Amino acid sequence: MYNPYFIYAKSGLGKTHLMHAIGNYIVTHSDKRVLYISSEQFINDYVSIVNSKNNNVSYLEAFRKKYRDVDVLMIDDIQFLEKANKTQMEFTNTFNTLYNNEKQIIIASDTSINDYK
């Protein structure tokens, strides 16, 4: 199995549809916990915690639990994380946690992996 599994195609060619199909298959044929999320939602979730007046450890822990307590993390349109520096660091930590715990990561992008820094 490939981990992470990187899906690359130009916009409008079915990456999101493919990710939904993969996620639905995993949920239907196993007891694995699957989380499908767009990078925009990941960014919004993180920014709302950082900017919250209730910015405390328990909210950050809840955020991390949501994204790290899964068997399969599917994140669509990862290219949007490129300009979100603080969120990139949080995503990298989430990625590393999942990877080190042998959890599956599936990423989709309209940018080739060779174009990432």
Regions found by a protein language model. Give the residues of each.
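Walker A/P-loop nucleotide-binding motif
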Residues: 2-20
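Conserved catalytic network of the ASCE P-loop NTPase/AAA+ motor domain
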Residues: 27-30, 65-68, 72-73, 96-104
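Structural recognition of the conserved hydrophobic beta-strand(s) that form the central parallel beta-sheet
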Residues: 36-37, 74-76, 104-110
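Short glycine-rich substrate-engagement loop in P-loop NTPases that contacts/grips substrate
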Residues: 31-70
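Short regulatory helix/loop adjacent to the ATP-binding pocket of P-loop NTPases
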Residues: 50-51, 113-117
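Conserved catalytic/switch belt of AAA+ P-loop NTPases
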Residues: 82-111
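P-loop NTPase Walker A phosphate-binding motif
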Residues: 17-30
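Catalytic P-loop NTPase motifs of RecA-like helicase/translocase cores
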Residues: 43, 80-82, 114-116
